[in-house]
Amino acid sequence: MSKFLSQAAINTLRNTRLGSRQLVRSFAGISNTRNHREAGHQEWGCGQSAGRGLLELRMPVACRRSMFIQTQDTPNPESLKFLPGVDVLGKGNTYDFPNGTTAHSSPLAKLLFRVEGVKGVFFGADFITISKQEGAEWSLIKPEVFAVIMDFFASGLPVLNDAQPNADTEILEDDDETVMMIKELLDTRIRPTVQEDGGDIVFMGYEAGVVKLKMQGSCSSCPSSIVTLKNGVQNMLQFYIPEVESVEQVFDEADRMIDSEFERFEKNLKTLKQQEPSGGGPH
């Protein structure tokens, strides 16, 4: 009975968000019927069995009952959203780990980056978005991610150690009226929709009519992110705030350099493995 009530509660929450999601997507000209998304994949744990993906796990019964993990597709085929059924960072909070070197502040992120094929990790209020390396298979990554998530939340360890979630839309004393309106609109109308897709938009600044934003999570490498940014976010900001002339996407150069180094390291590692002599006894 409790399982059905939990699912009903989840459906109710989704329905309450529908209005704002339709509003943002109407500005972007995006249909609500997305062919690329299969909503509501429901899975339990880390190794599928018959039926609805019920998974056997070597954990106490109480832990198994409390950890109900769902997966949800995102607009980015390289990213998948995991919903563990418990708070990850809490309402409105997000944190991005674009690569393994940024995971030092989170025990959970460190463990997830140990899963082969994981390229990026993103924490939301009640979800975790995993971005995979090109060519990696979800069928191999998902069971490992399920196991890490379930074991971690059963341990009771904090998700973040000494880091603070994004506070980019917090109103500051020196913010002028336009900046305050931009932050308010991002926080109340735009970010909830983007977070539903497993990502986030971070406010980086406003100058001379230009709003600078950084895409995170599934949105950072999504093929449609530019369309969403220009046609959806920009149109909405301009509709409510006449001072806004355009929206620009900001890229973190440090993250780009780290990603480049990781790619080079992985290529070198593959080359070394290919050069290793095949196993065999002495000749």
Swiss-Prot record:
Signal peptide segment: none
Keywords on record: Iron, Iron-sulfur, Metal-binding, Mitochondrion, Transit peptide
Transit peptide, residue positions per record: 1-65
Pfam families: Nfu_N, NifU
GO BP field: iron-sulfur cluster assembly
Claim: Iron is one of the keywords in the record: yes
Subcellular location: Mitochondrion
Region described as NifU: 182-250
Family: Belongs to the NifU family.
Chain's role: Molecular scaffold for [Fe-S] cluster assembly of mitochondrial iron-sulfur proteins.
Record-given protein name: NFU1 iron-sulfur cluster scaffold homolog, mitochondrial
Lineage start: Eukaryota, Metazoa, Ecdysozoa, Arthropoda, Hexapoda
